[in-house]
Regions:
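Class I S-adenosyl-L-methionine-dependent methyltransferase catalytic core
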Residues: 1-281
């Protein structure tokens, strides 16, 4: 559903899925099924295989447009290396692509997004809302260049995991884990954001400022930031022009014409209570 909103941006482009086994990835299957519908120029998919646990070599799938506009050509080749997205082999493929669409390993998400941004590539990535903790994502959000996607935001989804991972097991013996706060991240335009309709009014009693305390709750000379605390996005006061700390879920509703993101607060205190991480607007 997410990709349907980016048809114009996908048309005529080389898409790279660099964390996807061509034989089993739902991303690859979907893009192959919709190769002509989206007007892709080419689709490339590679994946990682740990050489310590498997003697198999990872494969590379290349799908390209046939001379017949109604068809396409599929080619499977063996990679020389282990298929790690950070390898020279996979970075060379990345450099030849236009758009990266994949579900990076959550444990390597920071490394992945840093590489993609450094490569100056367009991306549509499945991740979690907590990626806002990564400096490269926060910088992109502050600059208005990165945001979450169109699709229903902040969901819990199940992901298949290797046998040695902690997780649950389905009826067909596939092990999976539940991951909370799932969302899409992209640097493509997301045009469905509208200004929030705000109806609450500021008062010091309802919107206290953060205490002058350090990360352990000990008193300090100054507060970490001169901002009021807002516990819910719906409670943002309509008549306050100063700095506000709001829930990170605002990213999924943010209209950059209404608010400017200036930073993030990780360890704010209201009285003796430590509040959840806040986006500063």
């Amino acid at each position: 559903a997410e990709l349907q909103n980016h048809r114009n941006e996908l048309k005529g482009k080389v898409v790279y899925c660099n964390c996807d086994d061509p034989t089993s990835s739902n991303f690859v299957r979907y893009l192959c099924d919709n190769f002509n519908a989206y007007g892709l120029k080419a689709l490339i998919a590679t994946h990682y295989i740990d050489p310590q646990t498997s003697t198999q070599k990872p494969v590379k799938l290349t799908v390209s447009r046939a001379d017949n506009a109604e068809g396409f050509i599929r080619e499977l080749t063996t990679l020389e290396g282990d298929g790690d997205f950070r390898s020279e082999e996979c970075i060379a493929i990345l450099n030849s692509a236009d758009i990266v669409i994949t579900n990076p390993p959550f444990s390597l998400w920071r490394d992945f997004i840093d590489l993609i941004i450094a490569s100056n590539k367009t991306f549509i990535l499945l991740g979690t809302i907590h990626a806002i903790n990564y400096q490269s994502i926060l910088d992109g959000v502050k600059a208005g260049k990165i945001t979450t996607g169109y699709t229903n935001f902040n969901k819990t989804l199940k992901f298949a995991v290797p046998e040695h991972y902690d997780g649950k097991t389905t009826s067909n013996t596939t092990k999976y884990a539940e991951v909370h706060g799932i969302c899409w991240w992209t640097n493509l335009p997301v045009t469905n954001r509208k200004p929030l309709q705000l109806s609450k009014f500021y008062s010091p009693d309802l919107y206290p400022k953060y205490e002058a305390k350090n990360t352990k709750g000990k008193p300090t000379a100054t507060a970490p930031v001169d901002a009021i605390n807002v516990d819910r996005v719906a409670d943002i006061p309509c008549n306050y022009d100063g700095l506000m700390g709001v829930p990170i879920t605002i990213i999924g509703q943010l209209d950059y014409n209404q608010f400017e993101v200036v930073g993030k607060l990780n360890n704010g205190f209201i009285g003796d209570k430590k509040v959840f991480s806040r986006i500063l607007i």
